[in-house]
Design a protein with these regions (language model features):
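Nucleotide-activated donor-dependent transferases that construct or modify glycoconjugates
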Residues: 10-14, 21-48
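Conserved catalytic-core segment of nucleotide-activated headgroup transferases in glycan assembly
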Residues: 51-65, 69, 186-258, 354-363
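Active-site and donor-binding regions of nucleotide-sugar-utilizing enzymes
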Residues: 46-47, 51, 59-188
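Nucleotide-activated donor-binding/catalytic signature segment of Leloir-type glycosyltransferases, i.e.
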Residues: 253-271
Length: 372
């Protein structure tokens, strides 16, 4: 019976996409945003519910375009195409016909197609011979999804650093490690420094509940209330709450918990669009095993890690930086903010990221895409 609501939701999404097509095509034409030349394109077949996966790459591709690489976006859902138009200046090719997309890419001479997730619909595009197929993913973490056997389908997979190479080598049998390119995290290159503050700024950014037991990393249902209540009660803290955009998609209980927290702590909801910019703002970040935690490491933001699953990140951090049951959290946050990034966290940065030098990751990605 659980499949019925999901099926209805999918059908409703398809109907909404069809209804949006005419206006989106008109918007592309009126704004002269049609993709008519490109060296490298971002491919995205999903609807707006997964748009965050593409969104984290848009600014990077703007920077690559400014450096002379012709870039653009292919969207197979009209609603996602509209979001690209509204949130970027990149040219767009909207079509739900793979044959049409292949014809257009062949005509404009695209040399690389980049993928931001593990969507099954990527495989409709992967049949296209000629351009290099490059998997980018949308974040670095030790979630189970980061070692998908699907990686073998791509010509190259960009990874953050040595940890990802080690993880893939250990987890995916018969994988050609020569296909892995360590680039760091280009999404973090364009971030702006935060203005100084007299208070301690704390970001709580839990991940979503995942679509399987293996992906259930969220602290929100069990600890969200305890975390936010302690932090909000302390006048020395300025707190922002940033739940993952997919929270509640796979679990009614998680959806109910998230709705309750958003209502009770609406004054804490993070107003910032870019998740990396939210981390730059923070003096301390409280995160689950997710890209937010690893980006905090890359950005030298003192991290308190939630969850008790074994990971290299968890075992590498001092015990004081493990959330546990969130007891005495206010004092622990204050102490961590005062002491700054621990030496062990700094060592983890070198392990997880090939580079954290500003601009270097974007250059590494640009060099790869130009090489085709």
């Amino acid at each position: 019976m659980a499949l019925i609501p999901a099926t209805v939701h999918q059908l409703a999404g398809k109907a909404q996409s069809l209804l949006a097509e005419k206006s989106v095509r008109a918007q592309i034409a009126s704004s002269s945003r049609e993709l008519d030349q490109a060296d490298a394109v971002l491919f995205f077949a999903e609807g707006p519910g997964q748009f965050y996966q593409l969104d984290v790459w848009i600014e990077t591709f703007h920077r690559l375009a400014a450096a002379g690489l012709k870039t653009g976006v292919i969207a197979m859902d009209a609603r996602s195409a509209r979001l690209v138009l509204e949130n970027s200046s990149l040219p767009v090719l909207f079509s739900h016909s793979i044959e049409h997309i292949e014809t257009r890419l062949r005509a404009i001479g695209a040399r690389a197609i980049c993928y931001v997730n593990n969507s099954q619909r990527n495989f409709t595009m992967l049949r296209f011979n000629g351009p290099a197929h490059v998997h980018l993913n949308h974040g670095e973490s030790e979630k189970a999804s980061m070692v998908s056997h699907q990686l073998k389908a791509y010509d190259y997979a960009c990874v953050a650093g040595p940890a990802a190479v080690e993880r893939i080598a250990d987890s995916i049998s018969r994988f050609d490690l020569a296909a892995l390119v360590q680039i760091g995290r280009p999404q973090l290159d364009g971030l702006k420094p935060a203005e100084p503050s007299s208070t301690t700024r704390v970001l709580y950014a839990p991940t979503w509940e995942g679509d399987s037991a293996a992906m259930a990393y969220s602290s929100l249902p069990d600890y969200g209330e305890r975390i936010l209540a302690q932090l909000d009660a302390d006048p020395n803290f300025e707190v922002r709450f940033r739940p993952h955009p997919k929270t509640g998609d796979a679990s009614p209980a998680a959806k109910k918990a998230a709705a309750a927290l958003k209502s009770a702590y609406s004054h804490l909801l993070d107003p910032v669009h870019d998740p990396g910019q939210s981390l730059v703002w923070a003096d301390v970040a409280i995160c689950d095993i997710s890209a937010m935690a690893y980006d905090a490491v890359a950005l030298n933001v003192p991290l308190i890690l939630a969850g008790d699953r074994e990971s290299r990140l968890r075992s590498g951090l001092p015990s004081a930086q493990l959330l546990g049951r969130a007891n005495g959290l206010a004092d622990r946050v204050a102490q961590l903010a005062a002491s700054g990034v621990s030496g062990r966290q700094k060592q983890l940065s070198q392990y997880f990221f090939a580079t954290t030098e500003p601009g270097a990751a974007t250059k590494k990605l640009g060099d790869l895409l130009r090489s085709f």
